[in-house]
Swiss-Prot record:
It is found in: Cytoplasm. Homodimer. Pathway: Phytoalexin biosynthesis; hydropinosylvin biosynthesis. This is Pinosylvin synthase. Substrate binds at residues 57-60, 270, 308-310. It catalyses: (E)-cinnamoyl-CoA + 3 malonyl-CoA + 3 H(+) = (E)-pinosylvin + 4 CO2 + 4 CoA; 3-phenylpropanoyl-CoA + 3 malonyl-CoA + 3 H(+) = dihydropinosylvin + 4 CO2 + 4 CoA. One of its GO terms (cellular component) is cytoplasm.
């Protein structure tokens, strides 16, 4: 009696092609915040209008941020009902914050996911895996469980939670989705990132200017993607292929970006050296990623860069001698939404393909064949994703 052909079985489980992004959906809370008037609101709602010198400093930070507006769950009404959230670190507020997050993170995730599923055009019963990412939900079972329930996904959907990773995780989930899609023939992976500032919002402090900078940068948003290999002809349409991925920790960067969950919520630290640390290491990441494709002209690529702040984008652009047009989609998303942590790069991917179509480009990557996506975050960690565009027909 012949033995089981385990090798043949293993090969049958593998997809033939690269993982492809088959759909993208995004969502934001309805509350749009104008950056030009936010300093007045922020210092009034936190009871710090008397501190005019610090308020003027915050105004200058907002003016230099290159952000026009952001979307936030926290409205004046919500903050008035939860005054402890408006303190810096003087009073506990974690319970109040978590009560908000337990509702808002899954709700925003569901909205983005439904848009992605609608664009995909297939039954949600075809979703085999769920990767759920958030920096804001410590409950058990996790928000991945709640979102699967809200969407009515099949009980057998294989869930993975990516929690407490921060801003680089938009690249992390693409790396994970690639591995799942390419190693499980027929897999369709729903990837969701849902982030809200309800866990980090707090009043100003003269001794913690990094916290003040964060209050000027971050916004709320959720992204959702359908990822799968070997798109079904005439049924599914890829917008990008995920070709190669990597993660690296920047040397001598410990403590540059970090956060700690305490009774007062999630506090974060942002050192001023972050833009220089990223720009000093970005070229090594590019060489590692693209030498295998014999590409060394970075202007022949389309670019998706996590907008951790204006200074980071300026330093990366200068270090790599990028044409200013390369970061237009990235700067557009930063301007219109602020820093939405892990969800940002997916908003930029969506903007890139839409702008490519509107501008009459031949591919979803601004008429170019290949591109790069970068996520930056705590560690200091850099995620690198090599992408291939698809023709626009």
């Amino acid at each position: 009696m012949g033995g089981v052909d385990f090798e043949g079985f293993r090969k049958l489980q593998r997809a033939d092609g690269f993982a492809s992004i088959l759909a993208i959906g995004t969502a934001n809370p309805p509350n749009a915040v104008d950056q030009s008037t936010y300093p007045d609101f922020y210092f009034r709602i936190t009871g710090n209008e008397h501190n005019t010198e610090l308020k003027d400093k915050f105004k200058r930070i907002c003016e230099r941020s290159a952000i026009k507006q952001r979307y936030m769950y926290l409205t004046e009404e919500i903050l008035k009902k939860n005054p402890d959230v408006c303190a810096f670190v003087e009073v506990p507020s974690l319970d109040a914050r978590q009560a908000m997050l337990a509702m808002e993170v899954p709700r925003l995730a569901k909205e983005a996911a439904e848009k992605a599923i609608q664009e995909w055009g297939q039954s949600k019963s075809g979703i085999t895996h769920l990767i759920f990412c958030s920096t804001t939900t410590p409950d058990l079972p996790g928000a991945d469980f709640e979102v699967a329930k809200l969407l009515g996904l099949h009980p057998s959907v294989k869930r993975v939670g990516v929690f407490q990773h921060g801003c680089f995780a938009g690249g992390t989930v693409l790396r994970m989705a690639k591995d799942l899609a390419e190693n499980n023939r027929g897999a369709r992976v729903l990837v969701i990132c849902s982030e809200t500032t309800a866990v980090t919002f707090r009043g100003p402090s003269e001794t913690h200017l990094d916290s003040l900078v964060g209050q000027a940068l971050f916004g709320d948003g959720a992204s959702a993607l359908i990822v799968g290999a070997d798109p079904i002809p005439q049924v599914e349409k890829a917008c990008f292929e995920i070709v190669w991925t990597a993660q690296t920790v920047v040397p001598n960067s410990e403590g540059a970006i970090g956060g700690k969950v305490r009774e007062v919520g999630l506090t974060f630290q942002l050192k001023g050296a972050v833009p220089d640390l990223i720009s000093a290491n970005i070229e090594n990441c590019m060489v590692e990623a693209f030498s295998q494709f014999k590409i060394s002209d970075w202007n022949k690529l389309f670019w998706v860069v996590h907008p951790g702040g204006r200074a980071i984008l300026d330093r990366v652009e200068a270090k790599l001698n990028l044409d200013p047009t390369k970061l237009i989609p990235t700067r557009h998303v930063m301007s219109e939404y602020g820093n939405m942590s892990s969800a940002c790069v997916h908003f930029i991917l969506d903007q890139t393909r839409k702008a490519s179509l509107q501008n009459g480009c031949s591919t979803t990557g601004e008429g170019l064949e290949m591109g790069v996506l970068f996520g930056f975050g705590p560690g200091l960690t850099i995620e690198t994703v090599v992408l291939k565009s698809v023709p626009i027909q």
